Amino acid sequence: MKKSILFLMLPMLLLSGCSNQSHNMGKSTSDTAVLKDKSQNNDKADAKEKVLPKYPSKPPELNLFNSDAINHKELWGTMNGHDPAIFKDDASGKYYVYSTDVEIGSHPRPGAQIRRSNDLITWEFVGWALEDGIPEEIQAWTNATNIWAPDIIKAGNEYRLYCSASTFGSQKSAIFLAVSNSPEGPFKYRGIVVKTDTGDPVNAIDANLVVEEGTGQQYMVYGSFWSGINILKIDNETGLAAEEGFGKSIARRPRSVDGAIEGPYIRYNKDTGYYYLFVSYGSLFSDYHIRVGRSKSVTGPYVDFNGTELTNIEKNPYEVGVKIAGGYKFEQDLGWMALGHNSVLNDNGEWFLVHHARPEGEQNWPYMQVRKLVWSEDGWPLVSPELYAGEKLQKIDQSIIAGTYDRIKHFDFMLSVVEPSEKIYLKPDKTCMIDREKGEWFIEGDYRLVIQVGNITERYVIIPSWDWEKKTTTLVLTGIDSEGRCIWGKKNNSGN
């Protein structure tokens, strides 16, 4: 965060693809005939056996704008969950989230907030990671009043929490390490990992730890605005920096957009063989959104769907990185804006994206959100348009696909803080209407939907989910088109 988070610390006035190493692996439109053949084979299989989806059970209500909870932390749930870092404790099997010190309507207590869950759906506030707040050495350097964007990793039996401290608009920042023998703390200060001052090329906040596949070597990716995102080698034994300096630059944006990139997070996917660098673009109070690049090496270069490196500052700054999630609004339902500063969990092959967001027009109410993350056939992460409620990937019978859908395309440049949905029609005869243009659709495999309109091919994953806006079950779509734009959709069960 750069960090306009200062706004949240004040009492509220009103509580109301690839380069030489990685080329675009997406199928071209010339593959349509082959895909149709596969679809026809699926038709025959479906005629023999019909499999109905299993939808998740009704989850607890979100209970947004709960002013009664402001001074009762046991009622917070996902409220105040800002810059969330997800972690599953292998010892207990419980899920934890560590987040920035934010409290709606009051000055936040410093110490890094901890939340706990058994199912990734219901969350309880545990307390603060550091009982004594900001360590004296860190306070003296940064003059910080709260802790930002903590991240955690377990090394042997030691839980290591990497915390950031700074003030809004300043490079006088530090990332420090605190350790504990429990994921719930208390965490004790060990030392500074990296610190920055005015004029340095990077800003020492927003840390994330990643382990190199094969070697076990730890790295820390970090940075916010200025010259962007760096990756620094970490001493596996101490958890502190293993090299002098600030590390290597792996992502940045030009000054024309204020260098607005932060919240880096890297995870490796064994199935694809790529490391994925997730970053947030824009302002956390308005156009904040999540993009991704990938690399065969943990230290980069990271490239997008079209092969552009995330360090490229010559190209249009809104055309670098695959935009996987941003502000959105389905029909007349509550919109969500400023989705960003995410973390990622691989839970035994089930993937999840965890981030914060704000209800449209209510920037003073941040909430943590958990969404299911799936993968395209060519290895790009796709995020569910709905909050996680326990849904599972499963075989989808094509007989339940036809109908009216609300569809959102995540355009590179947003004209407003949310992208509104539009109607599309998937007809029983396997034709469709999108933007008044006729196309066709078919099923590929157990749960993949292909839509062809003109020279654009859209490939989706279908997930039987809970519709949080309409409070019912439905089919949701998350996909990417042949130009690298991500698209969301959900079936409108009140219509056709």
Give the positions of each predicted feature.
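Sec-dependent signal peptide recognition
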Residues: 2-8
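C-terminal motif of bacterial Sec signal peptides marking the signal peptidase cleavage site
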Residues: 15-17
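Carbohydrate-active catalytic/glycan-binding domains of CAZyme proteins
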Residues: 20-496
